[in-house]
Amino acid sequence: MASVRASPRSALLLLLAAAGVAEVTGGLAPGSAGAVCCNHSKDNQMCRDVCEQIFSSKSESRLKHLLQRAPDYCPETMVEIWSCMNSSLPGVFKKSDGWVGLGCCELAIGLECRQACKQASSKNDISKVCRKEYENALFSCISRNEMGSVCCSYAGHHTNCREFCQAIFRTDSSPGPSQIKAVENYCASISPQLIHCVNNYTQSYPMRNPTDSLYCCDRAEDHACQNACKRILMSKKTEMEIVDGLIEGCKTQPLPQDPLWQCFLESSQSVHPGVTVHPPPSTGLDGAKLHCCSKANTSTCRELCTKLYSMSWGNTQSWQEFDRICEYNPVEVSMLTCLADVREPCQLGCTNLTYCTNFNNRPTELFRSCTAQSDQGAMSDMKLWEKGSIKMPFISIPVLDIKTCQPEMWKAVACSLQIKPCHSKSRGSIICKSDCVEILKKCGDQNKFPEEHTAESICEFLSPADDLESCIPLDTYLRPSALGNIIEEVTHPCNPNPCPANELCEVNRKGCPSADPCLPYSCVQGCKLGEASDFIVRQGTLIQVPSSAGEVGCYKICSCGQSGLLENCMEMHCIDLQKSCIVGGKRKSHGTSFTIDCNVCSCFAGNLVCSTRLCLSEHSSDDDRRTFTGLPCNCADQFVPVCAQNGRTYPSACIARCVGLQDHQFEFGPCISKNPCNPNLCPKSQRCVPKPQVCLTTFDKFGCSQYECVPRQLTCDQARDPVCDTDHMEHSNLCTLYQRGKSLSYRGPCQPFCRAKEPVCGHNGETYSSVCAAYSDRVAVDYYGPCQAVGVLSEYSAVAECAAVKCPSLSAIGCKPIIPPGACCPLCAGMLRVLFDKEKLDTIAKVTSKKPITVVEILQKVRMHVSVPQCDVFGYLSIESEIVILIIPVDHYPKALQIEACNKEAEKIESLINSDSPTLASHVPLSALIISQVQVSSSLPSSAVVGRPLFHSLLLLLSLGLTVHLLWTRP
């Protein structure tokens, strides 16, 4: 579908027409309030037009829409017109959710300024509270966002063009030449207005004074080059002119090892001479998208993708070829879905749309682009389609008058293409083929269809899928959501993103210290995965990125440093993704998943990785069925726990041996009963502190110590990391606790319902002293009392295994529960059973910390990808050597909507693991997760529910650590 190519004024009029407002040219009565206000914009025709439309509008909804868009055409600097409209239209200038300055508010230094910014709808609203000379960063960010909103709106629904445009305005540094070149290459044919707008911005951007780098000229080895360098820096202004002049004057190309060019590289990021900031490593222009290139099915698209996202932007021809050959090719759905994950990840929830209103109030559905800009794009598309033609990249589809032929269905199509609802499993965003065929048969102008084309053939190309797990049924969006205020039961603190462009939004799961008010999210510093990337990772984390040249299967691991750049990169051995597996005489390519009996398997670089579940088949004899226990190696159902070297308690020695452990690698008794500090292996200057952990890496290579040595300090200056002692007293950190001579009970704030020690059995088969102790280990609780049974592993397992266990009641809302493997009691949750590559984990540990990688590390990383604070992540290593991840509601009485949200989060993460999406795979050690199976607990009607929640939903409050949740007492 083509975008509008018109002047800025005609584009504005099209916007107003699409809003349903007739154009009024000088139609306001002379002397009226509207005429007086609009006369303040007589030198800005675009602003005058929108002003007249505002005062002519009779519809509240249209007025609201126009007011939201007005700042794009009437800059905040036009104080007179804004003051006039404020006084002439009292009550209508309320906070706009779409204000471009909202994402800048965290940059405010003053608290009052920050609060005013978050309540504002325009820059005028903060001018009295926020002083420009003091809040430079805030006002710079707002001005940049205002300019970006105007420029990038010309991209229409062209995702790539809009993305490259937004990258120009995303940071407070001067746009790089490659960024500007990318916009020119990809947007020139789409919107000349956009190019002109961006050029105006980049040319006006305050550049660093070239004379600040004069000292670099002395590093040139050639005297003539030294003189040429000084002359060029004194006379040239732009970066391009300087680079071209130096190449010509010094007769040398820019080489990083050349002292002259090395100095320029350093000084470009350093404010003062001699203060060196090393240039970022070569991670490609966009490491996240480069990861997607290996998913291309054709060599042509793989090469084009690699060329575009590796070390230098492709030329215009490369972009056009990628657009023509790959961007809409159904064969390349894996690569395209991966790229979409990077550009616009699927996120739960959609609200505050003014045109696509049927998409609002859907807190448990996933969308890629629920934004005011996409909402506007859908309205613009509808206006274009009303002209009788839908322009697609390879075909123009003639249609009848869509204002009278199925208008609501066409609106659903336009909104779906822009808002992009996506499946939790496939993450696909295309509409279903049957809907496509139906609407084209009814409303397509079939007499004008291109030769040899029918509704079916057109839809076969545009929407080839009709599987409800791969396509979006339009029927869902032909009516408003059935949910009203109930949507408040599920919140999305980071959607839309409230943080500045260079920071990462994280859900606040720690609560507020001392019951002080605080935000439900936090903004943390991050790094981009390349110059042109908008994929941000947390500062201090390890990241896996493809090699900068884009060789398939070659990766490096980097750390996100304090500078905001990826640094300390370490190459990993390349993986041969061309290697296949032979299974049952059939060849399985890398990444293929399949089942063998009841086990799930995946081929990973020629290695077959399978779960180790014991299976019964239709051919099993009666004797086999009678003796079948469901346990590994068909071990007897006997609970005589042993503690293995990896820190995991196994139900019996038989099961420990079955998972590959030798007799000398485990000892009888649960791990929790062992004292790792006896004997004390720490030096006298350090204190031995128990630190139980379950390790996933090879013990012989990296060990798995169950303690840590902490320095004995006279003063404790560590950051706040609350812990609770055995007397139920809280301390700010471990250092303070031990300094006061206390013993650790559990990590985290003290909780009232853990005052009395009451043992509980965790899903991992470990007995904990309290619920809080289990939760500090990120283990959810199965039942009260010490562990006494092996638990259920399969549908064939005997129910007698858990006969002596008394399970707590399910939640009041009710659900169709699940039973985690090895547990006895059902619960309402989403569950993932994940296979991992142990060799990959060993490699990661070897090239990074040389320390073992633990289950808790995996869970903490996965936790960052759960966006709903009403759900939290727990898990353990099963006795079948799978990582079991549970996404469980945390509220007192979880509602059906909250259970559904946890289910959707689980399905989303399963899809990201199975598709090797960079959304997850970029994060070390999640890149070692190979394949996942999901199981969710669907909600039941309230009439089917009996009992009150006595355990699971209440105890999970600990995951938040919020004082508001401390109301519960045991019955």
UniProtKB/Swiss-Prot annotation:
Residues 943-971 form a propeptide. The keyword Cell inner membrane does not apply. It is a lipid-anchor; GPI-anchor. Keywords: Cell membrane, Disulfide bond, Glycoprotein, GPI-anchor, Lipoprotein, Membrane, Protease inhibitor, Repeat, Serine protease inhibitor, Signal, Tumor suppressor, Wnt signaling pathway. GO terms for cellular component: plasma membrane; side of membrane; Wnt signalosome. GO terms for molecular function: coreceptor activity; endopeptidase inhibitor activity; metalloendopeptidase inhibitor activity; serine-type endopeptidase inhibitor activity; Wnt-protein binding. Functions together with ADGRA2 to enable brain endothelial cells to selectively respond to Wnt7 signals (WNT7A or WNT7B). Plays a key role in Wnt7-specific responses: required for central nervous system (CNS) angiogenesis and blood-brain barrier regulation. Acts as a Wnt7-specific coactivator of canonical Wnt signaling by decoding Wnt ligands: acts by interacting specifically with the disordered linker region of Wnt7, thereby conferring ligand selectivity for Wnt7. ADGRA2 is then required to deliver RECK-bound Wnt7 to frizzled by assembling a higher-order RECK-ADGRA2-Fzd-LRP5-LRP6 complex. The Kazal-like domains mediate the serine protease inhibitor activity. This is Reversion-inducing cysteine-rich protein with Kazal motifs. The gene is Reck.
